[in-house]
């Protein structure tokens, strides 16, 4: 099906696709304009292998406007499982899970009718998004299983690695009552948002078995259904809905926003429920008919096609409203088209308080694709057309600070290649000079980071550059480089982002692509987090985050101009957030020293005290007063406040 044929298919303007139960009846609606017949098949269970499995009925649907097949069945069918059987003029018959299904049975082979009022945890109606000022935002990325699967986490065994592992707020290491873990730890770290790696239903974990495997989840199966392996009971579809919402509510009670990692750029395989519903419509193809694979791990969704765009926008809105999600991170955002991303931003903004919902993504793709109809990919070259509140991960910041992610031994500014200081200077002002071929409209568009789930952890990257094979040794040089790395991106304008555990030297022992496990490699090591040397590293992160919150100009979130760069020798960098170089009482001066020796740096006029010396950090000034000049510690970020 080419672009013109796709555009000739009828468009459905309603917002009620899927199964919608009320006390009077349950309406099923499916967009399948190329079908010649559709029936809905009802079941008592999510699979035929479960006790009580039986078919409850097969009902013929009728075609209406917009290519939609519909039927209304009596009663509220909450808890009933269903599929659609679709008949095509060429004789093909496809059985599919409803693309709009809100839940499913084990392994997602049947959808489930969900009345959201019957799948709400206690207090859900009182749940509210936390009010987090733009300058105070920072993101901490974690996988649901990684968060609490460690046997030392203090989370009870049946909740480890599950949505419910986020709900207790008093866990400690081995229940010692002293060393906080999980949410108890997170609520005092100083980050504002938790980004969850995919929590929708994905294909590569066997939900029917406790040991069904591990995967990051970038293999989407049912986009509007929570992943069953994260539920305490994957067989009853209401459980995953209720427990996912309970997780969100617990994070909200701790004052934390929730960002959802979404993968609307590709389907896991070419026979997805979407593609089997309207064959030839949902995925991009090359002129020879082969599906494009710009993600490198699946078949690209054609977001530029009208009903695909509608589906993506409505799916995002569903998670934002039904689960109170506070932000969305788009995997391989460059595979989405600009108009779709802008439509998502507009739709979120239309919600009460929706302008506070974060929206950002990866401005690259993993291979070639074939956008049609003049659509532009949502990459860094399209920032002129993207809404200013659609952000992007800055790989330039990532690589200049600590080295290129695709070359293990490649060094950056903090670990042996100080000449990258030219790029670090651009990072400070969120790359708003336009010197690197892209021009953000505002600082808040730029996600400033050095580590995420992909590639090496920060600690492992620093160890690789330093050729240190013992990842568990708290090497003093690596600790200094880690602190300096954090100190840089936490004083740059933009939105700071970190991988969970970066703040305690998280290691995967050199595994740079742990997407399918084992869990032992991926789970957070809460014992390591409380080893004295790594706990001190965490304290530094906590202090730098506190400084960032206390001094809003660091973020540039209110439209502040680029910082004033101080003239310093060699590869030293210094700046003051005030663009004219003045330093009134309470203002900051920031210095980076990438050298392994102490260096002298001149100070702006005035009297200064440290709030960070590269080892300790916090909002309370400490140590003596300084005027005129300051000796900077090796491999350090020093932050001073004017008296």
Predicted regions located by residue number:
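Conserved, mostly hydrophobic/aromatic
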Residues: 30, 84, 142, 196, ...
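Glycan-recognition and catalytic regions of carbohydrate-active enzymes
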Residues: 11-15, 494-511, 521-523, 527-588
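Beta-strand-rich binding/interaction modules
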Residues: 30, 36-48, 598-614
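Substrate-binding/active-site clefts of carbohydrate-active enzymes
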Residues: 145-323, 332-352, 358, 369
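Carbohydrate-binding surface patches
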Residues: 20-36, 563-604
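The feature marks proteins involved in alpha-glucan
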Residues: 1-23, 52-55, 64-168
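C-terminal beta-strand-rich structural cap/linker in extracellular carbohydrate-active enzymes
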Residues: 32, 78-80, 622-643
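Conserved alpha/beta catalytic core and glycan-binding cleft of carbohydrate-active enzymes
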Residues: 114, 345-346, 350-351, 355-505, ...
């Amino acid at each position: 099906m080419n672009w013109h044929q796709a555009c000739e298919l009828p468009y459905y303007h309603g917002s009620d696709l899927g199964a919608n139960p009320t006390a009077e009846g349950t309406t099923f609606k499916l967009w399948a304009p190329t079908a010649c017949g559709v029936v809905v098949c009802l079941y008592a269970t999510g699979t035929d292998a479960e006790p009580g499995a039986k078919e409850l009925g097969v009902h013929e649907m009728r075609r209406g406007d917009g290519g939609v097949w519909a039927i209304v069945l009596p009663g509220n069918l909450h808890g009933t499982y269903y599929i659609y059987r679709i008949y095509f003029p060429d004789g093909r018959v496809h059985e599919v899970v409803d693309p709009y299904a809100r839940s499913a049975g084990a392994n997602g082979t049947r959808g489930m009718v969900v009345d959201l009022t019957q799948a709400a945890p206690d207090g859900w109606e009182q749940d509210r998004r936390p009010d987090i000022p733009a300058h105070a935002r920072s993101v901490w990325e974690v996988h649901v299983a990684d968060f609490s699967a460690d046997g030392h986490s203090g989370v009870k065994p049946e909740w480890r690695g599950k949505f419910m592992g986020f709900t207790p707020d008093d866990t400690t290491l081995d229940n010692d009552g002293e060393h906080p873990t999980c949410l108890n730890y997170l609520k005092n770290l100083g980050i504002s948002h938790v980004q969850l790696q995919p929590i929708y239903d994905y294909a590569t974990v066997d939900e029917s078995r406790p040991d069904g495997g591990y995967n990051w989840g970038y293999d989407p199966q049912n986009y509007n259904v929570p992943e069953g392996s994260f539920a305490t009971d994957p067989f009853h579809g209401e459980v995953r809905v209720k427990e996912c919402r309970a997780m969100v509510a617990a994070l909200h009670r701790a004052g934390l926003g929730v960002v959802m990692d979404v993968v609307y750029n590709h389907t896991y395989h070419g026979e997805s429920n979407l593609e089997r519903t309207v064959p030839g419509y949902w995925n991009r193809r090359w002129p020879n008919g082969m599906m494009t694979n710009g993600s490198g791990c699946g078949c690209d969704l054609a977001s530029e096609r009208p009903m695909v765009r509608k589906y993506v926008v409505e799916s995002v809105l569903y998670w934002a409203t039904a689960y109170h999600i506070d932000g969305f991170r788009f995997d391989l955002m460059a595979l989405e088209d600009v108009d779709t991303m802008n439509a998502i931003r507009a739709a979120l903004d239309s919600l009460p308080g929706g302008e506070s919902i974060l929206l950002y993504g990866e401005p690259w793709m993993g291979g070639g694709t074939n956008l049609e109809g003049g659509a532009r990919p949502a990459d860094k070259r399209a920032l002129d057309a993207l809404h200013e509140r659609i952000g992007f991960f800055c790989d330039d910041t990532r690589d200049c600070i600590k080295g290129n992610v695709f070359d293990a031994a490649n060094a950056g500014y903090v670990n042996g290649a100080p000449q990258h200081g030219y790029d670090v200077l651009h990072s400070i002002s969120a790359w708003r000079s336009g010197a690197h071929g892209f021009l953000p409209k505002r600082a808040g568009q730029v996600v400033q980071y050095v580590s995420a789930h992909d590639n090496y952890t920060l600690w492992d990257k620093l160890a690789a550059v330093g050729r240190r094979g013992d990842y568990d040794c708290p090497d003093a040089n690596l600790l200094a480089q880690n602190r300096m790395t954090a100190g840089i991106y936490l004083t740059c304008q933009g939105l700071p982002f970190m991988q969970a555990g970066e703040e305690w030297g998280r290691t995967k022992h050199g595994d740079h692509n742990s997407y399918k496990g084992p869990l032992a490699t991926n789970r957070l090591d809460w014992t390591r987090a409380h080893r004295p040397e790594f706990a001190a590293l965490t304290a530094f992160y906590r202090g730098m985050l506190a400084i960032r919150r206390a001094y809003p100009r660091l973020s540039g979130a209110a439209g502040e101009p680029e910082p004033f760069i101080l003239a310093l020798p060699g590869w030293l960098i210094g700046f003051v957030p005030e663009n004219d170089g003045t330093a009134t009482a309470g203002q900051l001066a920031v210095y980076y020293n990438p050298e392994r020796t102490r260096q002298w740096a001149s100070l702006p006029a005035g009297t200064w005290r440290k709030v960070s010396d590269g080892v300790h950090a916090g909002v309370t000034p400490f140590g003596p007063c300084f005027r005129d000049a300051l000796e900077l510690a090796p491999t350090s970020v020093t932050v001073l406040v004017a008296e």
